[in-house]
Design a protein with these regions (language model features):
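Low-complexity, acidic/polar, glycine-enriched regions of mature
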Residues: 1-189
Length: 189
C-alpha cells in the first residue's frame, strides 16, 4: 500500500474556484450546559474563491440558514425560530473576504460575517492544500477554515439558566468549513 503526498501550501493558485458540494462541509460547535459540546451542520452552502494574477483574492461563502441539521426536530425548529436564526426573516448567512494573508503556515481570511442583520469583522484561520488534479482532469484545492465568534454579537441571544447555576449555552461558537474548490474551466479563445 502506498501513500499519496498532498501538497499543503499557503500560496493561492490563480483562477476562479467554485465549490464541490459533495466533498465539502460547513458546521458549528458550542458548549452545552457547561459539560459537553453540541455540534450541528448546514446542508446547503456555496463558496467561490477568485485569485488574481497579482495574488489578491476575493472569497464569498453563503449558507442557507434553514438547511441546519441537528439530531432532534424540536431543537431544529427552535434554531429556525426568532430565538436563534429567524430563518423566515433572515434566510442566509454570509462571509466575504477581500483580505487573504499568510501567517506562518496558516491561511488567514479577514472578512465580514453576517448573521441575521448583524455584520462583524471575523478572522478565519486554516489551511490550503493542493492544487491536485482529479482522475477526470479537474484541478482542485482544499480549504479548511475555523473562526470563533460570540453568538450574542449576531443576535443569537437565547439562553436559559440551569437549576444548579450556569447557563444552557455558551456564547462562544466555533464555525468550521472544509471545502473542495474546483478551478473553473478557462474560456476558449
Amino acid at each position: 500500500m502506498s501513500a499519496t503526498a498532498v501538497n499543503t501550501t499557503t500560496q493561492l493558485p490563480v483562477g476562479t474556484w467554485t465549490l464541490d458540494p459533495t466533498h465539502s462541509s460547513a458546521g458549528f460547535a458550542v458548549r452545552h450546559m457547561g459539560v459537553g459540546t453540541f455540534r450541528g451542520r448546514f446542508e446547503q452552502f456555496d463558496a467561490k474563491l477568485t485569485v488574481a494574477e497579482d495574488g489578491t483574492a476575493d472569497f464569498l461563502g453563503t449558507v442557507r440558514a434553514d438547511s441546519i441539521v441537528v439530531k432532534d426536530e424540536n431543537l431544529r425548529a427552535h434554531l429556525l425560530s426568532p430565538d436563534f436564526f429567524d430563518t423566515e426573516r433572515y434566510p442566509e448567512l454570509s462571509f466575504s473576504s477581500r483580505s487573504l494573508r499568510h501567517d506562518a503556515d496558516e491561511l488567514v481570511l479577514d472578512g465580514e460575517l453576517t448573521i441575521k442583520d448583524h455584520t462583524h469583522t471575523v478572522e478565519a484561520r486554516g489551511t490550503l492544500t493542493g492544487p491536485a488534479e482529479t482522475l477526470g482532469g479537474v484541478v482542485k484545492v482544499g480549504v479548511e477554515l475555523e473562526a470563533v465568534i460570540d453568538r450574542t454579537e449576531f443576535g443569537l441571544n437565547w439562553n436559559a439558566p440551569l437549576p444548579g447555576g450556569g447557563i444552557a449555552l455558551g456564547n462562544e461558537v466555533t464555525l468550521t468549513v472544509e471545502l473542495e474548490l474546483a478551478r473553473a474551466a478557462e474560456p476558449e479563445a
